[in-house]
């Protein structure tokens, strides 16, 4: 059974959209999802339903600036001006605490994909005690510290000139360009995301997967990766 609910974000303003998938029988284990950049948790519905058939309770939230965890269209790809990365991590922890109260006696696992895997790695450092296991999927290798610093500096400069809600094609290309280069000639802007052409076409045509991150979100993401 699939249900939706909201809970207050750590940013103090946003209601975090959440989906839970419940198995029909006894819950054998819990899996909490942490989705990637420029997507949303309902994209994992087919996967979650499969796990439900195996006895898993699956739950996940849309991160700040994603899916239905926004107050307006201008908030897509925006976290929080000062504490964005910490707020996203805090929301993951809030959901885990709520879920553990429902199912305190079963194994608890977390899965993070792409940006969500980076968040999960940070989460484990801060709140990992008690987790039964974690799946780090589509994650990044060790990042160049100089490049991260340059990325942060560029975002700060652009924020001074344009504001933290500014969407920079330059920063976006710096982050995603290397992935695209390996898939030429490219049929879409996101050939690197999946080899399943049907899923790829659904992805690129989905307005909730088509926005550009603000310099705020990129800056906060770079800060998190540095941790």
Each language-model region and where it sits:
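Alpha/beta-hydrolase active-site loop
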Residues: 80-100
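Active-site glycine-rich loops that stabilize anionic/oxyanionic intermediates
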Residues: 31, 35-39, 114-115
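Glycine-rich nucleophile elbow surrounding the catalytic serine of serine-hydrolase chemistry
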Residues: 112-122
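Active-site nucleophile elbow and catalytic-triad environment of alpha/beta-hydrolase enzymes
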Residues: 213-227
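Conserved alpha/beta-hydrolase
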Residues: 41-75
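N-terminal cap/lid segment of alpha/beta-hydrolase-fold proteins
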Residues: 1-25
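Alpha/beta-hydrolase fold nucleophile elbow
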Residues: 103-114
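Alpha/beta-hydrolase-fold enzymes
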Residues: 122-208
């Amino acid at each position: 059974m699939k249900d939706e609910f909201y809970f207050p974000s750590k940013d103090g303003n946003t209601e975090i959209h959440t989906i839970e998938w419940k198995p029909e029988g006894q819950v054998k284990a819990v899996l909490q999802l942490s989705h990637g950049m420029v997507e949303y948790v309902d994209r994992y519905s087919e996967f979650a339903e499969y796990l439900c058939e195996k006895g898993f309770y699956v739950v996940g939230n849309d991160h700040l600036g994603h899916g239905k965890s926004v107050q307006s269209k201008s908030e897509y790809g925006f976290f929080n001006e000062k504490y964005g990365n910490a707020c996203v991590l805090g929301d993951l922890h809030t959901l885990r605490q709520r879920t553990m109260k429902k199912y305190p006696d079963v194994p608890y696992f977390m899965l993070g994909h792409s940006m969500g895997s980076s968040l999960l790695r940070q989460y484990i450092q801060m709140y990992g005690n008690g987790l039964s296991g974690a799946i780090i999927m589509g994650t990044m290798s060790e990042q160049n510290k100089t490049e991260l610093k340059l990325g942060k500096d560029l975002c700060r400069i652009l924020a001074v000139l344009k504001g933290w809600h500014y969407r920079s094609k330059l920063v976006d290309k710096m982050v995603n360009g290397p992935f695209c280069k390996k898939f030429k000639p490219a049929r879409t802007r996101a050939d690197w995301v999946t080899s399943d052409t049907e899923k790829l076409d659904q992805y690129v045509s989905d307005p909730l997967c088509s926005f550009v991150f603000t310099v705020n979100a990129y800056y906060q993401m770079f800060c998190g990766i540095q941790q």
